[in-house]
């Protein structure tokens, strides 16, 4: 169950209240409030008991936040239920999106009754917050952010304060396996390598791995491929490394591609995206990975797996024109095998050196860095947040 850990969080309320009470008792400072992840909204009760406001740090994009508010609103006002759209070809008109949203990219967990209602409870908690910090920036998601600001339903103040990324000290974080990867990249020409990496819970079994291998070999592009074992079906666990990658890959693949590619297990994603040899990124479209790829000006080919990643892929490809599609509505539980031809097509497209998408990603990369500078958009919203937190104390 995707939501089994929420019960565990709920059980920590008494402990959190005790810890915070002790902390404030020994300090001359007053408690300004709580900052909560959306899945920790059970801690709202603790904030209320302590008589302080709470704020949400939303780690996905503004378009998805707007989608959540829309879903909860039509449920509460019209008794609409997203589960009716399972396996549907319908399209939804969502205020935070400029284009109609295909039902096929809805998060799978929201198409199951009990999980859908758990989401509704969470979103109601978001509406009661004093403010919501979103890990995005105005120049990236202006339509979504403006729609949230103009929404007539009860939505708290929104603060686009991103991109918030962990970028520093990468040379100290990569470890021995990472160092070997970076040394290999040092020998590759600029923007010549396509990087395939699918997040902490992304992995593939032998059948899909063979199609990816075939696509890479056919594409004739240099590649760095982080290939990991998928979590057990139905389990929310991180991927693990294969003991022997050669048992998963086609016979002779490593020998035939020895001069053009490297297959590894775990890989230090940020340090790799930062490397000048990387020219494209086949990604699961986790929001952090999207922000990292934009920051380092690396275009994405979308291959979402779980959570809201299909929605993110739609946002990047259709809404923003910042990515190419391999498969926008792929879901890891579907057991569909993507063909080598489809994967190869996406790789060739994302690696085009003078494409419009590459140009747009470079422009957005510059904007993402500028947004964090003094007096620019995200800096402005961070200042506004601090002012509002101080004002809410009185």
UniProtKB/Swiss-Prot annotation:
Lineage per the UniProt record: Eukaryota, Viridiplantae, Streptophyta, Embryophyta, Tracheophyta
Q: What is this protein called?
A: Anthocyanidin 3-O-glucosyltransferase 6
Q: Gene3D superfamilies under this entry? A: Glycogen Phosphorylase B
Q: Give the UniProt family note.
A: Belongs to the UDP-glycosyltransferase family.
Q: Where does an anthocyanidin bind?
A: 307
List the catalytic activities from the record: an anthocyanidin + UDP-alpha-D-glucose + H(+) = an anthocyanidin 3-O-beta-D-glucoside + UDP
Enzyme class, broadest EC rank: transferase
**Residues noted as binding UDP-alpha-D-glucose in the record, renumbered to the chain:** 59, 267, 269, 284, 287-289, 292, 308-309
Q: What SUPFAM superfamilies does its record include?
A: UDP-Glycosyltransferase/glycogen phosphorylase
Q: Which organism's genome codes for this protein?
A: Manihot esculenta (Cassava)
Where are the active-site residues found? 37 (charge relay)
Q: Tell me which UniProt keywords the record has, alphabetically.
A: Glycosyltransferase, Transferase
Name its GO BP terms in alphabetical order: anthocyanin-containing compound biosynthetic process
List the InterPro entries hit by this protein, alphabetically. Answer: UDP-glycosyltransf_plant, UDP_glucos_trans, UDP_glycos_trans_CS
């Amino acid at each position: 169950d995707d939501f089994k850990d929420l019960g565990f969080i709920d059980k920590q309320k008494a402990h959190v209240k005790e810890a915070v009470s002790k902390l404030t008792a020994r300090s001359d400072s007053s408690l300004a409030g709580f900052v909560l992840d959306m899945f920790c909204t059970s801690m709202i009760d603790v904030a209320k008991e302590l008589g302080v406001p709470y704020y949400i740090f939303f780690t996905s994009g503004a378009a998805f936040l707007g989608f959540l508010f829309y879903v909860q609103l039509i449920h509460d006002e019209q008794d609409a239920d997203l589960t009716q759209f399972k396996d549907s070809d319908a399209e939804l008109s969502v205020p935070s999106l400029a284009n109609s949203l295909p039902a096929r990219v809805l998060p799978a967990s929201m198409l199951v009754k009990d999980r859908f209602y758990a989401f509704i409870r969470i979103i109601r908690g978001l509406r009661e917050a004093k403010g919501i910090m979103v890990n995005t920036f105005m120049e990236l998601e202006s339509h979504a952010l403006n729609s949230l600001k103009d929404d007539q339903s009860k939505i708290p103040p929104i603060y686009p304060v991103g991109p918030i990324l962990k970028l520093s000290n990468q040379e100290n974080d990569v470890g021995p396996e990472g160092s070997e990867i970076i040394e290999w990249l040092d020998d590759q020409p600029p923007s010549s390598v396509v990087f395939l990496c699918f997040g902490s819970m992304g992995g593939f079994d032998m059948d899909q791995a063979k199609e990816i291998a075939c696509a890479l070999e056919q594409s004739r592009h240099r590649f760095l491929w982080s290939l990991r074992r998928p979590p057990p079906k139905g389990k929310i666990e991180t991927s693990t490394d294969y003991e022997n990658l050669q048992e998963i890959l086609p016979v002779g693949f490593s020998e035939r591609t020895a001069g053009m590619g490297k297959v590894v297990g775990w890989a230090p994603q940020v340090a790799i995206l930062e490397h000048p040899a990387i020219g494209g990124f086949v990604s699961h479209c986790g929001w952090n990975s999207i922000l990292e790829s934009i920051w380092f000006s690396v275009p994405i080919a979308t291959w979402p797996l779980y959570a809201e990643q299909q929605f993110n892929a739609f946002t990047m490809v259709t809404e923003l024109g910042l990515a190419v599609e391999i498969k926008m509505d792929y879901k890891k539980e579907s057991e569909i095998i993507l063909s080598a031809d489809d994967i190869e097509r996406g790789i060739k497209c994302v690696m085009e050196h003078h494409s419009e998408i590459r140009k747009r990603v470079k422009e957005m990369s510059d904007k993402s860095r500028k947004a964090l500078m003094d007096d620019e958009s995200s800096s402005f919203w961070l200042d506004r947040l601090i002012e509002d937190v101080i004002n809410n104390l009185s």
